């Protein structure tokens, strides 16, 4: 059986991991467009402009969900059943619709929707910035963590936050960021930048971040140093993967997400930022949802 694979469109041009997609709608007509792979989204999201093309029975009765965005803001979304093709595979899943937001203005060409990480996990897929493909996982990782420039497991983030996260370490201070392919620019809070002392230089004062709830947050642009923890060190001497990045800095909140608790009701560390698709593409990261590992290979 042929293994699943789908080519990503030119990420330098699109800014996001985008795949060509198609679905059969009313009157047996085939509709062609694109979908975005969003590792910062749990669920699949359908663009509201697609709704008139769906079968009348596509809405799932009683299937609604409040989907949250930055700072805990949420919006109630209706679930729809969608069968679709990407690459050489055909899939079916529940997609949720935010009827207050139209994604067409954000993307070039007919935009069908967003593929969340639960879909990637169920179907054992890999978002591969090195080969610029979405493909089936091999089910195992070659070599040891020390053989990679960066290596980190998704298990903690997925278990506690239901999103893949990475840890930042600066001396005795630790922070968390979402590995978010749905963010074209890395976003952090000013609290993180100032508290960790990671500013290299200020670049610009005028920027914005648009959230899933349609809220727009004003930002400033900075060059910062990100020291991301990687498997292979010790508690006393962690292995750090250090890269500079141009980031959007939010000043009106201390954290991106806070007030979170685990299954036992214990407080969880707040989330201080979102690591972008641009960063992961630039550094050729591989996010393997079949094995639950994120990594970057060492240069040959």
Where are these regions (language model features)?
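Pepsin/retropepsin-fold aspartyl endopeptidases
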Residues: 1-300
